[in-house]
C-alpha cells in the first residue's frame, strides 16, 4: 500500500489555539485524523509527524527514504529560512507537496518567498486546513486513469488546475 507522510513544522502543534483568525479552530490532531481516514478511503497509508525543531524534521525525512511514496509538508516558518530541509527533501528524492494554511502571498512580504515551491510537485496555499485534504486528494488522483487535466487563469492571476473527467472535480489553486 502506498504511504504518504505529512510533515508539519514549528508552532503547528498549536493549531486551533494560535491565531484562530488566521489558522482556524481545527487542531493538528483533527487534520491528521481526517487525512488518515481519507487515505484509508484510497488505500493509502498516511503517517504524520510534527516538530518545532529543524533537525528532527530532517531526521524524519531521512527515515522516510525508500519507505514513503510522497511527503505533504507544511514547513511553517522554515518555509522562508531552511535550505537544510529543502536539501533533505531533495536528498531522499521523495516527491512532495507544499501546503500552507493561510495565503502566505497576502501576508507580510517576507512570507512570500519559499525555499520549497520550485521543487514541489504542487503547492496548496490559503485553503485553510482543507489544504491537507486537497494534497491527499491530489496525490491519490494518480490511481485514476483517463483523467482530463486542465488549467486556467483566475481573476487574480492565480493558476487553477482541475480534473474535469472526475465525477466530483477537484481544484488545486496555485497563486
Swiss-Prot record:
Protein's UniProt keywords contain Cytoplasm: no
Enzyme class: lyase
Keyword Lyase applies: yes
Enzyme Commission identifier(s): 4.2.1.10
Keywords, in A-Z order: Lyase, Quinate metabolism
Sites where the protein binds substrate: 74, 80, 87, 101-102, 111
SUPFAM superfamilies: Type II 3-dehydroquinate dehydratase
Pathway: Aromatic compound metabolism; 3,4-dihydroxybenzoate biosynthesis; 3,4-dihydroxybenzoate from 3-dehydroquinate: step 1/2
Pfam families for this protein: DHquinase_II
Active site residues according to the UniProt entry: 23 (proton acceptor), 100 (proton donor)
Domain of life: Eukaryota
Biological processes per GO annotation: 3,4-dihydroxybenzoate biosynthetic process; quinate catabolic process
Record-annotated site: Transition state stabilizer: 18
Gene Ontology molecular function terms on file: 3-dehydroquinate dehydratase activity
Signal sequence extent: none
Catalytic activity: 3-dehydroquinate = 3-dehydroshikimate + H2O
Subunit field text: Homododecamer. Adopts a ring-like structure, composed of an arrangement of two hexameric rings stacked on top of one another.
Family: Belongs to the type-II 3-dehydroquinase family.
Function, in words: Is involved in the catabolism of quinate. Allows the utilization of quinate as carbon source via the beta-ketoadipate pathway.
Name under which the protein is recorded: Catabolic 3-dehydroquinase
Species assigned in the record: Talaromyces marneffei (strain ATCC 18224 / CBS 334.59 / QM 7333) (Penicillium marneffei)
